[in-house]
Amino acid sequence: MRFKGSGAYHSPQGTIALLGGPYSNHVALRAAAEDARRRGAVALFCLGDLGGFGPNPGKIYPILDEFGISTIAGNYDQSLAERRPDCGCGYTHPRDNEYAQRSYDYTDRRTTDIERAKLAKLPPSIRFTRANRRVLLCHGSPRRVNEFLWESACSDAFLMRLLRDAEVDTLVCSHTGIHWQRRLPDGGILINVGAVGRPANDGRTETWYALLEEGSDEARFIPVAYDFESLAREMEEESLPAEFVETIRTGWWTTCLEILPAKERARGRF
């Protein structure tokens, strides 16, 4: 894990990989990192939320180190580092918060002091210039670490103002768990990379990450096939909620549904 307190980074050229929250899914994270390297990625970035949802959160850190993945802090990471009582996910519905709390309590109990110290060093964002475009990597949005940028809820005008206020041409975010991107009328680009640790509520067991390839300013979303059944069994061994395990095995969300806007929820099973 590369800790850059300033959030500055050298300007990476060539193909780079952008990964959303691992959510303790160490099997998918490793599969995505290996796939990105095979595809020629010269730099890998993770947009935070290392823990939550999956089992044995400590298995994430060696993978970040092994592949040299530069990482920023998500709301989960900030909460764990500061020993807050909850994940600060930004949910408002009691059912969403109930499952979020069960996930957070499990992760909190299994996070060591050494790991908390690592999380405390993660920068909130990373900025760099690539092919004359100013790029910002953040977790939720430039305004709030837990702001949800849903495709159906974000107008062009809102996104253009968001990028303009952040002084960037390309904004890369995560937090929602569902990947999407949009080129704006003024040339700005919003890329939400979703999450590498959980399916995108699309009925597929694969998870997703994004590639920014040399010569392109738009992302290509890459599905990650991994041994989801081994992860599901590990989750069961750790007595994680059956609803979480079902999502891994089916690709459909069973929790954190109430936060979804109507259009995003209509694409799912529940």
Predicted regions located by residue number:
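Active-site-proximal segments of metal-dependent phosphoesterases and phosphodiesterases across multiple
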Residues: 91-98, 131-166
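Anionic-ligand binding region
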Residues: 156-196
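Conserved beta-strand scaffold positions in the cores of enzyme catalytic domains, especially
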Residues: 18, 71, 171, 190-192, ...
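Beta-strand-turn-beta hairpins that frame and shape the catalytic cleft
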Residues: 8-17, 128-136, 185-189, 217
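Acidic, His/Gly-rich catalytic cores of divalent-metal-dependent hydrolytic chemistry
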Residues: 11, 183-270
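Active-site environment of divalent metal-dependent phosphoester hydrolases
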Residues: 23-28, 52-55, 76-82, 143, ...
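Glycine-rich phosphate-binding loop signature in dinucleotide/nucleotide-binding domains
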Residues: 11, 36-41, 129-131, 164-167, ...
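Core catalytic region of metal-dependent phosphoesterases/phosphodiesterases
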Residues: 3, 7-9, 14-19, 24-109, ...
